Every structure is written in C-alpha cells, then in structure tokens.
Amino acid sequence: ARGRRVYREALIGLARWGGKSQVSAALGLSLMYCEPTYEGEYYVVATTKKQAGIVFDKAKRMVLADPLLRATTKVYRAVLEIPETGAIFRVLPWDADTAQGFHPQAVVIDEYHVHRDASMREAMLSGMVGTENGLLITISTAGPERKGPLWELLKTAPKDPRAHVFWVGATDDDDGHDPKVWRRANPMRWITIKMLRDQYRTLPFPVFERLHLNRFPSTGTNRAYPAGWWHAAAG
C-alpha cells in the first residue's frame, strides 16, 4: 500500500570492526527523527544491558554532536526523549518475558549470534503487530556454529518478501586464507590488510573466519550455507 514500508525486517551481517554499533545507532535515530511517531518506542536490544549500552552510547553521542537534535531532545543516562512527540529511544536488556508488554515502532537487536534462542526477537515482532510501518533490525557477526537463532534467521530471511538481507562476508567457495577474500569481507577503509594479517597469525582459523570473514565456521556435518542467502544479500 502507498506509504507502507516494503520491508518490516532487516538482517545486517558485518565482520568485527565493521561499524555495527554505529550503523545500529544511526538507523535507530533516523527512524525516530525522520519518521516521527507519537509516543513511538525505539529500542536497542542485546543479551545484556552493557552490550546494548554500546549501541545506545553511540546514539547519544550522535545526538549531542548535532545542535538541532540536541535542542529537540532530552538526553538522559539511558533514554533519549523527544518531548514534542513523546518518542523514546532506550536500551532494553534481554528479557523476553518483560518484553511482552512493549509495542515498539522500531527495534535494533545487536549481536544476535549471542542470543540463546529467538524468544526476544519473537516478542518484539509480536509487539509490532499493531504498529504501522514498524521495523526490526537484526545486526550481527557470524556465530561460532552453524546452528542457533542467527543461523536459522539467515536461512529464512532471504525467502521472506518482507525481509531485507545485507550480509558482507566470505562464502563457502572463498579461500579464507587469501588476502583478497579478506579485503572483500572487510571493505571498510579503516580496516587494513596488515590488521587482518596480524589477526590471521594470532587467532585459530575458525575464530578468524568467524570474526574477520563473517563466515560461520564450516565444521561438523552442517557445512553448507543456506541456498540463495548470498544472492539475496548481494541483491
């Protein structure tokens, strides 16, 4: 319908040092300020309040650095509020039972690979049912195993017409020992080949593969990436 959001979910995958926290903060603030909703609720979710606080602190710094945003926003220790609309942006630690009472306009779930299950994400999606143009953003680095909620989401999201996948990382066909692959998995200018080479020499390869190639380690019997995920991410 006209004026309705094409995507209700987004899955973003970036390697370590890729700027995930900054991206999450910028997206959350963009939604709160550029799509004003009366008493809109905007949350950052992670496994702990400390982890979610990393993203929130980035958002708070962005607001304080901009004169216009600073003038229209009340900045508290763990909450940003726009008095004119009553909208709030805050940290929400992982607690699926408590989250049942929220009705968010937008949610950023940070480092989803650490989540034990999908209960928090499901609670947030359930709370958005009556929200027009709600958006749930899941952002993460690859997990240590090819199982769990992030792996399952990576399998289902590319097939969902209401979900958008943007996953930057190596594929199973890529040689993880090749610096050219490292560069493609880390296109950010602030990440150098020297930095990656130091990590390659220091870390066990499965750890390097996960953190710096953003690829789930190909161990065990479940070796293949979900069919079509890379094309969906690249497209």
Model-found features: residue ranges?
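Non-catalytic, compositionally simple segments
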Residues: 118-235
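Catalytic P-loop NTPase motifs of RecA-like helicase/translocase cores
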Residues: 18, 99, 115-116, 145-146
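Conserved Walker A/P-loop ATP-binding site and its immediately adjacent core
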Residues: 40-59
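Inter-Walker segment of RecA-like/P-loop motor cores
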Residues: 55-105
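Walker A/P-loop
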Residues: 5-28
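Walker B catalytic acidic pair
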Residues: 110-111
